[in-house]
Regions:
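GST-like domain detector, emphasizing the conserved glutathione-binding G-site
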Residues: 1-105, 111, 115-118
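Short helix-capping/linker segments at secondary-structure and domain boundaries
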Residues: 7-9, 58, 139-147
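Short, flexible loop/turn segments with low-complexity composition
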Residues: 61-70, 169-179
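Residues lining hydrophobic/aromatic ligand-binding pockets adjacent to catalytic sites
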Residues: 93-99, 118-121, 145-150, 163
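Surface-exposed helix-capping loop/turn segments at secondary-structure junctions
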Residues: 112-123, 167-171
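GST superfamily/GST-like fold recognition
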Residues: 120-145, 162
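C-terminal end-helix/capping segment
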Residues: 151-168
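Acidic/histidine-enriched, glycine/proline-rich intrinsically disordered or flexible terminal extensions
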Residues: 175-190
Length: 190
């Protein structure tokens, strides 16, 4: 979403993580997604760093002015830890309900923030919203009925708004997994 807001064009490759292409491993030995290889050859391997890099180049909506690093770190650390164990308990030999309860604590923090404003750092969306929203989306999708039944009306409305946004719909292009020899795909599509 930050790439779209910043007007940063790139070639996009969909990767099936169970069959990581050698090109991904060569660019980023960590071989996780997303990865961006900048025009100068430098590699950025973290979503938030890709967002910051693109917005530092061009930030027409002032997203970087609405950044709460502590909230993003809480999301990327403790919340993601609990999300992974709630969503994939078989991978972690964990109790999904215990991790759902722990993850819900951050949801309450987000709900409280949204009581006073439309987005997490003000009335307009910013980098904090874009960084956290995909994780809230994943958390909600594990058990949509449970999530929708929680007393989180502002968070639920915030999530619905981001899911319905043209920005999100444009960002979530569905692609076939990339294979060596495939023609480059421009993002955003021309």
């Amino acid at each position: 979403m930050a790439l779209l807001i910043s007007g940063t064009a790139c070639h996009i490759r969909e990767v099936k993580l169970s069959r990581k292409p050698e090109e991904l491993i060569a660019a980023s030995p960590k071989a996780t997604v997303p990865v961006i290889v900048r025009p100068d050859g430098d590699v950025i391997e973290e979503s938030i760093e890709i967002m910051r890099w693109s917005l530092e180049r061009n930030d027409p909506e002032g997203w970087l002015e609405r950044e709460d690093r502590a909230l993003i770190e809480a999301n990327d650390g403790p919340f993601k830890h609990h999300l992974d164990r709630y969503k994939y308990p078989e991978r972690h030999a964990s109790d999904p309900l215990a991790h759902r309860a722990a993850g819900s604590a951050l949801l309450g923090t987000l709900e409280a923030r949204l009581a006073a404003q439309d987005n997490l750092c003000g009335d307009r969306r910013g980098i904090t919203d874009a960084a956290i929203f995909p994780f809230v989306r994943q958390f909600a999708e594990v058990d949509r009925g449970w999530f929708d039944a929680q007393p989180l009306p502002r968070l639920q409305a915030w999530l619905r708004g981001h899911l319905a946004s043209i920005l999100f719909v444009t960002a979530m292009v569905r692609l076939d997994p990339w294979r060596p020899g495939d023609a480059p795909l421009e993002f955003p599509a021309a």
